[in-house]
């Protein structure tokens, strides 16, 4: 057996630079292979996704076509009499809708017309209130001749014709919603608040008070 020579053994070992040079091409080859595999998988996934979307759209379109075809087929299966009844029912439904809309429009128009009518009456009555108050004072404090009394009665009837109601009388219960108390007078005989004197009459149309009656109120003594 020959003797082991350490120096010869070390000289025969490859250098580190040579090993690095051999490892680098191997690593580069591995990276290239991995990138190629990833690109192949991505390329395969994109057509698959596109195909899936296309299949979904096609299925939806087929469903809509089948639904339309089913409706058309249902109409085709009707007899001429059945088809006529179906069309008549559709026309009747449309006519009923139009009639309901017309009735609603007519009701709104009537309410609007009545509102304008009342506004016109209120404007005229408001302008004539001072004259009406003077007529009431003449009636209360002096006697009217027949001609003047006839004119006053015609005015009252004209306002009644348009739905104007005159209110406010001595002895009626005091109501703050229609009476304007200008004075409260204690009365030992009064059990509750009542109208003692009507200074100016009140007027209303229906439930709407145009002017509250101005009154003197007799109140119970505490």
Curated annotation (Swiss-Prot):
Q: Tell me which UniProt keywords the record has, alphabetically.
A: Chaperone, Cytoplasm, Stress response
Asked whether the keyword Heme is assigned, the reply is no
Biased composition (Low complexity) is annotated at: 20-71
- Molecular-function GO terms, alphabetical: adenyl-nucleotide exchange factor activity; protein homodimerization activity; protein-folding chaperone binding; unfolded protein binding
A GO BP term here is: protein folding
Region annotated Disordered, chain positions: 1-82
Q: Where in the cell is it found?
A: Cytoplasm
- The principal location of this protein is cytoplasm
Note the InterPro entries from the entry: GrpE, GrpE_coiled_coil, GrpE_head
Which cellular component terms (GO) are annotated to the entry?
cytoplasm
What does this gene product do? Participates actively in the response to hyperosmotic and heat shock by preventing the aggregation of stress-denatured proteins, in association with DnaK and GrpE. It is the nucleotide exchange factor for DnaK and may function as a thermosensor. Unfolded proteins bind initially to DnaJ; upon interaction with the DnaJ-bound protein, DnaK hydrolyzes its bound ATP, resulting in the formation of a stable complex. GrpE releases ADP from DnaK; ATP binding to DnaK triggers the release of the substrate protein, thus completing the reaction cycle.
**Subunit organization:** Homodimer.
**The family this protein is said to belong to:** Belongs to the GrpE family.
For this entry, the protein name equals Protein GrpE
